[in-house]
Amino acid sequence: MSAGEAFAGGVAVVTGAGSGLGAGLARHASGLGMTVVLADIDGAAAARVAEELRAAGGSAVDVVCDVRDPDAVQDLAERVYRDVGAVRLLVNNAGVEQFGYLWDTPVANWQRTIDINVSGVFYGVRAFLPKMMATDERAWVWNVASVGAVVAIPLQAPYIVSKHAVLALTECLYLEVESTGHANHIHVQVVLPGPVSSSIFESAGGIDANGDVVAAEAQRSAMLDLKATAMDPTDAAGALFQQAIDGRFYLHTHPDAVGAAMAERADVLASQRSPALRTQSRFDTTKR
């Protein structure tokens, strides 16, 4: 079965759809013939992408939604099922970054990262999945983690913690769906993207002036350097949709680099050795 055959005519809900990977996923879903609900805290950004999709002949609805608010996410689910239709694809994508040493991280920034990156995924699952399971129709739940879900990186601890949590949440959810007899029609998958063009690093939280701002901004700069070779979001989306149809649990944008990171993580755990600082980016292919 092709992605077009699986998804055409269905409804996709994408959080964080106003930019980056979320916008790419929305564009690709629309290209497959899906009605796309674009949810974002930045209503203007979601509206721009939705208008682009409509101008190209697609069906799109933009909604302002703060995934930190469980009531807002529940209301989104109720509105979608009432006004648009049953959801075939739920993408819990909204996320933020955070730079700086953990001891320099403002409590508010820690909470923001966890609230959006982890609780936002939970709220999405809690609001939509019971409705998706209530029918026998095939449906997909994608929770967007990161290659950061299988690595340890200094100066990005809140983000890395949050993505490890999303991976664990999705693994548990997969087993719960299976144990309740819904795995024949509900497909739970985790997305582990590598560098994809977005503004996540520019909008990342920083630290207070009395912390090591130089170190925090150096890490931001290092991550921004990845943008030079980052994947186009729409290209990334195409790869993810195909992998989803192939039945994979782990969906990758950079299979070689992410696969190597997963193998490295497995080796660290199996050998029970301490984490090791890296001297180069895992996405630098020039030195392999």
Residue ranges of model-derived segments:
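Canonical Rossmann dinucleotide-binding motif of NAD(H)/NADP(H)-dependent dehydrogenases/reductases
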Residues: 2-37
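Conserved glycine-rich Rossmann-like NAD(P)H-binding loop of the short-chain dehydrogenase/reductase
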Residues: 32-48
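The beta1-alpha1 cofactor-binding region of Rossmann-like NAD(H)/NADP(H)-dependent oxidoreductases
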Residues: 43-44, 64-75, 107
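Substrate-binding pocket helix/loop in short-chain dehydrogenase/reductase
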Residues: 101-102, 109-111
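Active-site helix of classical SDR
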Residues: 125, 162
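Residue(s) in the substrate-gating loop at a strand-loop-helix junction
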Residues: 146
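SDR active-site lid
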Residues: 179-254
